[in-house]
Design a protein with these regions (language model features):
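C-terminal motif of bacterial Sec signal peptides marking the signal peptidase cleavage site
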Residues: 17-20
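Pro/Thr/Ser/Gly-rich low-complexity, intrinsically disordered linker/stalk tracts
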Residues: 22-58, 88, 101-118
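Solvent-exposed loop/turn segments flanking beta-strands in beta-repeat/beta-sandwich domains
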Residues: 54-69
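A glycine-rich, often tryptophan-bearing local segment used as a flexible ligand/cofactor-contacting loop or short
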Residues: 181-302
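Catalytic beta-strand/loop cores that center a nucleophilic Ser/Cys/Thr
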Residues: 252-357, 362
């Protein structure tokens, strides 16, 4: 009897179970259609991906992966995407997936992109403004020399900086030298210090690009954030200048009369430069001649390291304090300076987010066009510049 009751209960439970399953509406898994016809076209190093979207309901956008890592998420019925300045001589795999508003993502379609190139990085000259006819005579002389000596070099306008990359242009020279230009980087030519141009210059150095900043352009080292504003060049002049009979030279032994000297005469930027002996100048030792007698503008844009606004240590001296605070090397000062006063040529090393190097020449003697005659030491100006550009591209 007990056995029959148990059998009856079991049959009843099975019946209930079957009835419950038949009442459940099981949803089928949606089929996520994928994109088709994925292809690319290349314009130099810019690559445009194109594809066809599936004809499916609920499509919300696409996802693009580069070598398996998310590169972009695009909303809506998008059928193309631009990848700017892709790496050369390497295989890159782009995968495009369709995304749906139910949260599902389709399988991807993949295309291999390869741009072959044997081009080498070039030197660049950044104009302070696009209109060359408005350049100062010293800026024009520097530009003419650059064009003559770097036929493969690139002359850039400020507007070009948005599309400049260190692997194509590894170094950029900026020369600004003007009578009557007030101190402060915001007083540099307006095109040069536009917000987008300063941001592009900063990104250029952060990505490993190198800058040569000469005369009033040395102030850009603060504009791009490589040094703080209070450590911008603070020894400044912009007057018309005057006649002189002496020779203006650069002293590469910083602290010449001090207990601890910093001798940079073997540095690469001085290779081959003509020196003038102490017997002729009265300065400490042999110094590097940059400008001979005649009419000279006397424009400085450098650092007085004794100025307390720099907020640097004076231990063991202000030159070392400046170098430590800014991760730099002071390579030269005025030739007549025998102590630790001033920094006229400064090499700012790669530092933190700034992977590139910034080399500044702010000495008054670095004048590209002596107004009343040919500078008898013009060859030293030119060789110093060439050496600096060679040093920066290493």
């Amino acid at each position: 009897m007990k056995t029959n009751i148990l059998k009856t209960m079991a049959v009843a439970l099975v019946g209930l179970s079957l009835a419950a399953c038949s009442d459940v509406d099981i949803q089928s898994t949606p089929y996520s259609e994928k994109v088709t016809d994925l292809a690319y076209t290349a314009d130099g190093r810019d690559v445009t991906l194109t594809w066809q979207l599936p004809q499916a309901e609920g499509l919300s956008g696409v996802r693009i992966d580069k070598d398996g890592t998310l590169a972009a998420e695009l909303d809506g019925a998008v059928t193309s995407w631009l990848a700017k300045h892709v790496a050369v001589n390497t295989d890159i795999y782009y995968t495009v997936k369709a995304c749906y508003d139910n949260g599902l993502t389709s399988e991807g379609q993949t295309v291999k992109v390869r741009i072959d190139s044997d081009a080498k990085a070039k030197a660049g000259f950044l104009l302070p403004q696009a209109d060359e006819s408005t350049l100062d005579d010293d800026e024009k002389a520097a530009l003419d020399w650059f064009r003559a000596n770097y036929p493969d070099g690139v002359v850039l306008t400020p507007a070009d900086m948005a599309d400049v990359y260190p692997d194509e242009i590894s170094e950029i020279w900026v020369q600004v030298d003007r009578v009557g230009m007030p101190q402060g980087w915001r007083n540099l030519p307006s095109e040069l210090v536009a917000d987008d141009v300063i941001a592009a210059l900063a990104n250029y150095v952060k990505n490993g690009g190198n800058l040569l900043l000469t005369k009033h352009a040395t102030q850009l080292v603060a504009a791009i954030g490589r040094v703080s504003e209070n450590r911008a060049p603070n020894l400044y002049s912009d007057g018309a200048g005057g006649e002189g009979t002496d020779i203006w030279t650069a002293q590469a032994i910083v602290g010449y009369d001090m207990t601890e000297r910093y001798d940079h005469t073997s540095h690469a930027i001085y290779k081959g430069l003509v020196t003038v002996p102490e017997s002729q100048t009265g300065f400490g030792g042999d110094t590097y001649a940059l400008e001979g007698p005649g009419m000279r503008e006397d424009h400085n844009c450098m650092w007085d390291c004794n100025n307390t606004s720099l907020e640097i240590s004076n231990e063991p001296n202000v030159i070392k304090g400046f170098e430590t605070a800014t991760n730099s090397t002071v390579l030269a000062t005025w030739a007549h300076v025998r102590d630790y006063c001033c920094a006229g040529i400064v090499d700012f090393n790669p530092d933190g987010d700034y992977l590139g190097r910034v080399l500044c020449i702010g000495l008054n003697a670095y004048e590209w066009n002596q107004n009343d005659r040919t500078n008898e030491y013009q060859s030293n100006i030119e060789l110093l510049t060439k050496n600096c550009l060679d040093y920066l591209k290493q």
